[in-house]
């Protein structure tokens, strides 16, 4: 899951899980795996909500893993009511079965170890037993992955990994001997299989290529949007299934070989530019993230436009009321936007950082509430106000309208871990939200970016947009499952491209 665990962000009344595994080979040579389903009770639903509120829908950028002292395969995915997609692998000989998240936001494979005796999270899941495998090779090197809300630690081992009918030999992976219970205890998967670029160990995907197991140097995801169907989705190694997309893919080059990262252009709410990414932003497609995360300044505008109710932040309103008209005057006087807040002594830097890089955890419940922390928040709110007001000035809005709009946005600020609810009866009046990728607009309808939890009168509607500001990579969007459901996604390792086409 990359650098911070991507959560089951919503809970559910019924959950569909993999069924007795059935392997089949179709006429196109692709291998498919049968699915099963299982009911989950109300307790599981509440646990899923708790995981969200603990902030697990957010990445902690900068993967902090540490090390110390000839065909194609199709993996069927299970759709956890639109909150996560996972499938089954085997480790060892004979294969020991594990359910894993196939995660394009990280590169390491880990599963619980039988030597994990003090963690409830380990005991609640399948655990790898090295003594039961004839192909196990000892390594013993310490390994750890630190997430935003917890961590796993353990040691590296080596064994065969079975995916579909492919057997990847001598694969390094972490046997987790300790897992953060608050993060992993109630998860419906055992471990994570990373599909990003190599960091501290050779990824499974690299070994597939090195061992000549796939025809093409690319893999692709199709995520089924119909949660009531048994088939949750499909991951194809070594190619793509033409039955799961329409038209041609739009490809963009990978800009940073750590995540599957690429450049995007403007983000639009309806037909209106938000302006922030018009000069260019970075994004990456992340199969291990449930929602769609982006810069607070823009996500706040989106959630305001769809009527999502978040946290009223009085400090934000204080900045707008005290400094808003001065900000407008400076913007109209053509003062460089990234210097305005330092001119007003709200920020200590002078244009050295972009807006997104200084928005760290504005409303993080764990923030230090010292005077220094408060000063940083005032700086952050000022920078966000500059972004909002600059865009409204471009729309020729009056000063009063700009101030009122900024105050409204303050009311819709939220933490990355907070559920933002909308009125389920207003979906038809909500705008589409579009991302410009490769010069083409990829739109999301309300039905695609709003997630529904529950049934009947108990149904709740949740915004699929969550705020998250990267501190190292600048303004960044994580295009998670909310985006990958409507768009079939190709990860082309051979040409270092990411491609999107309408899913079928």
From Swiss-Prot:
InterPro entries: Aspartic_peptidase_A1, Aspartic_peptidase_AS, PEPTIDASE_A1, Peptidase_aspartic_dom_sf, SapB_1, SapB_2, Saposin-like, SaposinB_dom. The record marks 68-69, 309-310, 414-415 as: Cleavage. N-glycosylated. Glycans found at Asn-139 include approximately 6% oligomannose, 82% oligosaccharides of the plant modified type with proximal fucose but without xylose and 6% oligosaccharides of the plant modified type with proximal fucose and xylose. Glycans found at Asn-432 include 14% oligosaccharides of the plant modified type with proximal fucose but without xylose and 86% oligosaccharides of the plant modified type with proximal fucose and xylose. Residues 25-68, 310-414 form a propeptide. The active site is at residues 103, 286. Pfam families: Asp, SapB_1, SapB_2. Aspartic proteinase with a high preference for bonds between hydrophobic residues. Cleaves alpha-lactalbumin but not beta-lactoglobulin. This is Procardosin-A.
């Amino acid at each position: 899951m990359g650098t911070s665990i991507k959560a089951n962000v919503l809970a559910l009344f019924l959950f569909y899980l993999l069924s007795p595994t059935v392997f089949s080979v179709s006429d196109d040579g692709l291998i498919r795996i049968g699915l099963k389903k299982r009911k989950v009770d109300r307790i599981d639903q509440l646990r899923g909500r708790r995981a969200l509120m603990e902030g697990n829908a957010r990445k902690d950028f900068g993967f902090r893993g540490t090390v110390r002292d000839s065909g194609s395969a199709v993996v069927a995915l299970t759709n956890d009511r639109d909150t996560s997609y996972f499938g089954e692998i085997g480790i060892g000989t004979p294969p020991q079965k594990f359910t894993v998240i196939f995660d394009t936001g990280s590169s390491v494979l880990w599963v619980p170890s039988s030597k994990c005796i003090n963690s409830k999270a380990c005991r609640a899941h399948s655990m790898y037993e090295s003594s039961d495998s004839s192909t196990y090779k000892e390594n013993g090197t310490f390994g750890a992955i630190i997430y935003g809300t917890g961590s796993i630690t353990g040691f590296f081992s080596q064994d065969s990994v079975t995916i579909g009918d492919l057997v990847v030999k001598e694969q390094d992976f972490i046997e987790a001997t300790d897992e953060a219970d608050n993060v992993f205890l109630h998860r419906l998967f055992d471990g994570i299989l990373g599909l990003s670029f190599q960091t501290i160990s050779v990824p499974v995907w690299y070994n597939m290529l090195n061992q000549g197991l796939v025809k093409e140097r690319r893999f692709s995801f199709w995520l089924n949007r119909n949660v009531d169907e048994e088939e949750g989705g499909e991951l194809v190694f070594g190619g793509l299934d033409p039955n799961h997309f329409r038209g041609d893919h739009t490809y963009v080059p990978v800009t940073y070989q750590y995540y599957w990262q690429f450049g995007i252009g403007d983000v639009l709410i309806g037909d209106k530019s938000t302006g922030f990414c018009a000069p260019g932003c970075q994004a990456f497609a992340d199969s291990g993230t449930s929602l769609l995360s982006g810069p607070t300044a823009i996500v706040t505008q989106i959630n305001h436009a769809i009527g999502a109710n978040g946290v009223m932040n009085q400090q934000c309103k204080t900045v707008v009321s005290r400094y808003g008209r001065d900000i407008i005057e400076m913007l109209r006087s053509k003062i460089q936007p990234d210097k305005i807040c330092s001119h007003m002594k709200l920020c200590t830097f002078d244009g050295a950082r972009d807006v997104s890089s200084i928005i760290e955890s504005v409303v993080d419940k764990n923030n230090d509430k010292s005077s220094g922390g408060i000063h940083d928040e005032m700086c952050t709110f000022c920078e966000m106000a500059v972004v909002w007001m600059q865009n409204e000035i471009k729309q020729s809005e009056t000063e009063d309208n700009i101030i009122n709009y900024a105050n409204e946005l303050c009311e819709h600020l939220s933490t990355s871990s907070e559920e933002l609810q909308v009125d389920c009866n207003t979906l038809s009046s909500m705008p589409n939200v579009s991302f410009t990728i490769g010069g083409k607009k990829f739109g999301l309808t309300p039905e695609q970016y709003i997630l529904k939890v529950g049934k009947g009168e108990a149904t709740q509607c949740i915004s699929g947009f969550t705020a998250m500001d990267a501190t190292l990579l600048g303004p960044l969007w994580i295009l998670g499952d909310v985006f990958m459901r409507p768009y079939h996604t190709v990860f082309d390792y051979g040409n270092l491209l990411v491609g999107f086409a309408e899913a079928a």
